[in-house]
Amino acid sequence: SSAASDVYKRQANIDDADMKEACDLIRAGELVAFPTETVYGLGADALHPEASKKIYAAKGRPSDNPLIVHISKFEDLVSIAREVPPQAKKLADAFWPGPLTMIVWKNDRVPYETTGGMDTVAIRMPKHPVALRLIEGSGCLIAAPSANTSGKPSPTEASHVALDMDGRIPMILDGGPVGIGIESTIVDLSEETPMILRPGYITQEMLQEVLGEEVRMDPGIIASDSTRKPKAPGMKYKHYAPKADLVLVEGETDKVVARINELVREKQQLGQKVGVIATDETFLRYEADHVVSIGAREDEDAIARHLYKILREFDDWNVDAIYSESFATPRIGQAIMNRLLKAAGHQVIPV
């Protein structure tokens, strides 16, 4: 593997030569990590079966987990879909480029290696200049999951990628910290009624408003049933998990604080190091080894951005247990809670 400095290409100076090198690597069937507006992606030529296999190998991820295909224009979707659902154009006009992934029936151009063996394909147009330059410059559609090893929190800055992918990939395009920090909303358009398979920044209400029809929410988002074959990435395995055991405590604020402090004391008496995920409002009320505020409770965008970074920080501090407040906020709260519930393996204590 080359020195880290060769791999790193900072946004400020991702010059044409760097971009050309990245595009050449993609065309040659190699892997390049790149920023999107949601998280860093681990990209390869989506229509090249061997390239997609390299992604699974680098991530250590099971290959029945579909990859999202990143495109730069609506015609790219048309070129790989068996049929274009009527909703696709409406949603693309409203939300692309942006954090929305659509699932449609694939045609024969898309190898099963990219779709995790499914007859459907997940497609998104990212809203990030580096991502779009890479797609356009390589002339390839780029399959990319998040650029972390499987089960680790998703990377929101290039240093996270370097840490996880050390020596496994030839290039990281460093675009600085990313904006949203929570993955795209995934909507399945392959059936009669559109269905959200993964909540995200674009909400159910927003989709319904644009489509003027009902959009359902996959019951699996709330339940933890992992027996069905996953149609969307990350639906099957314990995901975004920190190394420590994470438990959510849910209820009225004063009761939550009291209960978490009680749990922290119990763990500390056993000689364990404990972390707490708090908000700006409650931060000073906890007595744990490491208390981190995820932001102001009203500021959903900050909570979303900080979530994965904070889960990684607890890994760095080697805490044994983490307790978190619950963030069932109105707008993207559903998406945030979905991530936290998965990270916690659905361990919730109501108070």
Residue ranges and their predicted role:
Residues 1-2:
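Blade-terminus and WD-like Trp-Asp/Gly-His loop motifs, strongest in beta-propeller folds
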Residues 5-351:
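Active-site-adjacent structural elements in enzyme catalytic cores
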